[in-house]
Structure formats: structure tokens, C-alpha cells
Amino acid sequence: MQRRTFIKNTALSAVAVSAFGFIEFDGKKYTGDCETTTDILGPFYRPGSPVQNNLAIKGEPGEFIELSGIIRHRDCTTPYQKAKIELWHCDAKGVYDNSSPDFRYRGTTYSDEKGHYSFNTILPVPYDVGDGSIRPAHFHLMITAEGYQPLVTQLYFTGDVNIKKDVYAASPKAKRRILNVQNLNNGTKKVVYDVSMVENLTVETATIDKLTGIYTDKADKTKSVEFFKSDNALWRKNEVFGAKFDYTGNNTFEYPGMPPGMYRKLYFEILVSGNIQLTVDYMNSNATKHTVVYLKEK
């Protein structure tokens, strides 16, 4: 994957782009109608990145940039201390480090008592995903805070001509995540992204679209399941219409309203090949656990 275009931006100031919507006064304080959406973890996420917020590598090409922001509670005002923030992105050639022990351009940090976090790294670049389409430059973030659903998201940058052609970046829900870039006097850049955590996240429309389709049982090619989107939710097709599944975080959907002791969970994994693997775990009424693995080819 090759670098296609460097981001050029002449913004005069950094703007804090928050992942929440309208603020309203409840008679005592301002509270937020927190509009937060999440993505499914893509093929380039690696757990266990080291605790480090300086990801820049000496001698490597790239434009230096600082990403900073504030993590807040559900009320959109109270800082959240010790939220875990994981950042990962490609290098200046559009390549991700998916296996080396160095965890290049990958790091973890924690918010302080004021909810503040920051990373110093390089500006990622657009890259060819392999089929001729170009993904706009972006940061990947995963934010984990006790009491809330983990937030997985992607941050884009104003001025990137590839945004309008990308189904994820061009989504109306992504507008708050297209960040203005401040050019600092020392020649580096800065972007700001604030987040308010919520208990239940809405999955991006484009993400639901990616998960829909027919999945074939890996152990028995004669069996398959089909998923479709309705009212921006994921449904499994049946002989009448379908069964709706709720997103519960960490790439997992669950069928709601199951009796105690019973469950049906869907875990999606987007593979580097572009294929999507689905693991279905369920417990039936006789307390027997079942696991079936399916695959949807690209």
C-alpha cells in the first residue's frame, strides 16, 4: 500500500470536536444529549499495545502531530479519570505494523484527573485498500471506561479529498469525527477530539452494511445464515422476517430477551483478507453450549 496524498490544511486553530450532541439545562446544570456512535474493530487492531503516548519513531518520515482531548462521563461535563485510550494507525507509507514486537504507531494511555489524554505521533496517510479504492487518512481509537460500553472509532482530517468517496468517512454520523488540523509555529500539527462515554452505543450505518450478507458454515458448506439491515439494526433472516440483534460492544451482538441462563451471541471478526468471520455462541434450554463458525467472503 502506497502513500497517495499528504493532508494539507491551513486551519488557524484547533477545534475540539466532541462525540456528543446538544447540551441542555436541566435547572441545575448543563447536561448532554450524548450522540456517540461506534465502529466494529477492523483487521488492524492489536490488543496489548504498550503504555506510551509518544509514538513517533526517530528517523522515520512523517509530519508530527499531537492528538489530545478530554474523556467525560455520560453527562458530558464530568471528567472521567483513568479511561483507557488505545491509538493505532498506519505509517507514512500506508502500512500497519500487525505483528512486530515494537508495536509501531500503536500505544495506550490513560486519562488524568481532568479527563485529559494526549498522543504525539505522525499524521497517517491515505492508502489503497487493495481493490483500487483509497481510504482517507485516519486514526483508530478504542476507549474503555468502567461502567460504559467501549467506544471504537475512526478520526479523519479536514482537507482530505478521499473522504467524500469513502463510505465510512462520508457517513453523516462521521461529520463530528472529521477534525480540523492546527498548524503550530514549531512546524508540527495538532487535532483535538473530546469524547463522552455512554452505556449503549449506536453502530454506524456503514458498519451494519458491511456485516450484512450470507455467511457459510465453515464445517458444513451446505449450511448458511443471512443478515440484513432494518431501521439501522442488524437482523438475522428467518422464514417470516428476521430476528433483531443488539450491539453490546467488542464486535459482539446479542439476541435480547432470552430467558435466564440462555443466550445467543454473534461475534464478528474482520480478517486482513477482507473476509468476515462470524462466531455464533448460544446456550439452549438444557444448558448445553454450542459454537458455530461462519465465513462471509469478500
Each model region followed by its residue ranges:
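Bacterial Sec-dependent signal peptides at the C-terminal "C-region" and cleavage site
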Residues: 19-29
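Peripheral terminal and inter-domain segments
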Residues: 196-298
